[in-house]
Each structure stands twice: as structure tokens, then as C-alpha cells.
């Protein structure tokens, strides 16, 4: 994402980790306009469908709220079918002249599946249960993969909340568009 346009808001890290029968989606609170931090406590994680679905967004805030509303409508139309609702949203996003201009990505999770939805119409399920988006996404993803591997090999009692918090903290230490004001939401299946 090009952060040189001083008229657009950028910067976030959203991370989702699914381990065992639990999934956590976390996001930082920083909103950046050009080279200025506009807000440090934005809430980019939201629950939908009677708290059975967690979503997190990266990109333009107004665009993300438009997508939240659309996704909520799809979930009402297809209750309990997260994959179908997300595919329907992605189709609309790709085909609708207005929606195609939206600049956002989403991570969406329920008790059984985690998905990444892009503006290009992609709906992707991460292979290893770990997904990350946003300017610090790759940093959080690398940290999460390393910590999950360490958990598997050496520390099976390492809590999922610790892995998520530490991965987000590492991203915040490196990415100037990410801060340590982390919001986490969890679903246990």
C-alpha cells in the first residue's frame, strides 16, 4: 500500500490465529493520515451475526464499514454459512462498479473457518490457521508462525492469547503504521 497520499488514511495490522477449537482475531488501534497519526485507539475488530463471527479490516475506514454492512446482510441471508456469505460478498465486491473502488481487506472468522477477503474478489482460507493483513501484516504473520511452531515443539501450554499479543507487539515494534493498542476477540468452538 502506498502511504504517500496525505489525503488517505492508512496503517493497521490485523492478525487471526486458529489453534485447536479456538480462534482469535486481533487488530491495533492506529490510524495514519499521510505521515500523521490521527488516532491511536481505533477499533478495527467487530463482531457480527449475533457475536458468532469476528471481522477485522485493513484499509480505508469508510470502505471497511461499507463492507461490514454488506457482509452482515449476506450473513442474514445465509445464516451459519460464513463461507457462502463471504463468497457472495466477494462476488458483489468484484462486480459492482461502486464496490470495486473500495480500498480494504478483511479477515473473517467463525467457530469453524477463517477467511481473508480481498477487493480483487479473492476468498482465501489460510493453510495453517494463521492470517494477517495490513501494513504490519507480514511482520505479525512471521512472528505468529514462529511462535506457533515453538508452541508445537517446546511449549504446548503457551496460551493462544500470548501468541497473538506477542505477534502483534513484534509488528508494532517494526511497523510505523501499527501501535500497541491491541483489541482481541475470541471464539471457542
Swiss-Prot record:
Activity regulation annotation text: Allosterically activated by HslU binding.
Keyword tags: Allosteric enzyme, Cytoplasm, Hydrolase, Metal-binding, Protease, Sodium, Threonine protease
Cellular component terms per the entry's GO annotation: HslUV protease complex; proteasome core complex
Compartments reported by the entry: Cytoplasm
Presence of keyword Glycoprotein: no
Keyword Metal-binding recorded: yes
Superkingdom of source: Bacteria
Catalytically driven reaction(s): ATP-dependent cleavage of peptide bonds with broad specificity
GO molecular function ontology, one term from the record: threonine-type endopeptidase activity
InterPro entries linked: ATP-dep_Prtase_HsIV_su (IPR022281), Ntn_hydrolases_N (IPR029055), Proteasome_sua/b (IPR001353), Proteasome_suB-type (IPR023333)
Residues reported in the UniProt entry to bind Na(+): 172, 175, 178
EC class (word): hydrolase
Gene Ontology biological process terms, A to Z: proteolysis involved in protein catabolic process
Active site per database record: 12
Physiological role: Protease subunit of a proteasome-like degradation complex believed to be a general protein degrading machinery.
Self-association and partners: A double ring-shaped homohexamer of HslV is capped on each side by a ring-shaped HslU homohexamer. The assembly of the HslU/HslV complex is dependent on binding of ATP.
Family per similarity comment: Belongs to the peptidase T1B family. HslV subfamily.
Name of the protein: ATP-dependent protease subunit HslV
